[in-house]
Design a protein with these regions (language model features):
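Short, Lys/Arg-rich, polar N-terminal cytosolic tail immediately upstream
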Residues: 1-23
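Structural signature of hydrophobic alpha-helical transmembrane segments
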Residues: 56-67, 122-134
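Alpha-helical transmembrane segments of helical membrane proteins, especially in multi-pass transport
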Residues: 96-125, 129-133
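The first (N-terminal) embedded transmembrane alpha-helix
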Residues: 22-47, 162-163
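Juxtamembrane boundary at the C-terminal end of a transmembrane helix
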Residues: 167-178
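Membrane-water interface of transmembrane alpha-helices
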Residues: 66-81
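Interfacial loop-to-transmembrane junctions
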Residues: 141-163
Length: 178
């Protein structure tokens, strides 16, 4: 797909193909972090899985969301471009959504620690949520850095981004305790 076609599909004006921060990749990564946190919150509240089951549930959830997201992108592109898509279009959509899986692995890493005898499964899932919240805060801060915001505004963006993670965990907690 050409750069012009990508602009039409995404509805944004991209200054170039090569940027220091790839906003699409970062947004997919954030999407995966939040999705992983939703799965983790459900695991903490509802189940008593082994550490390995918890890890697999988080990662397989990321894989399922990746597939759904890539498929939605493919359908959207077909409609926007009004043409049949090629195998390379399918491969690109899958590749562009890959950060969802990467982030699923990142938030699932603490779920492996009980296997080493370092903590309980419940504690590891809490640690996974904290990892997600910290990553969201870092993303918010770095977004402010990339747009040359003041230090105070960068901190505000970090707090706001972390707040999204806390809200996800809180909503899941409330839903599972009502």
């Amino acid at each position: 797909m050409s750069v012009t076609e990508m602009k039409e599909v995404k509805g944004i004006d991209q200054p170039s193909q090569h940027r220091a921060v790839d906003s699409h990749t970062l947004s997919e990564f954030v999407y995966g972090i939040i999705t992983g946190m939703v799965v983790i919150a459900a695991l903490v509240q509802e189940r008593e899985d082994t550490w390995w089951q918890a890890f697999l549930i988080i990662v397989s959830g990321a894989v399922a969301v990746w597939m759904a997201h890539a498929y939605a992108e493919i359908i959207g592109e077909r409609l926007a471009l009004r043409r049949r898509l090629t195998g390379s279009d399918f491969a690109r959509a899958m590749r562009n959504s890959w950060p969802i899986i990467t982030s699923g692995f990142v938030v699932a890493i603490p779920a492996l620690l009980p296997g080493l005898g370092l903590m309980s499964v419940e504690t590891s899932l809490t640690a996974s949520n904290l990892v997600g919240i910290v990553i969201l805060a870092l993303v918010g801060y770095l977004a402010g850095t990339a747009t040359k915001e003041s230090q105070m505004y960068r901190i505000l963006l970090a707090v706001g981004s972390a707040g999204v993670g806390v809200a996800v965990v809180a909503i899941e907690y409330i839903v599972h305790h009502l």
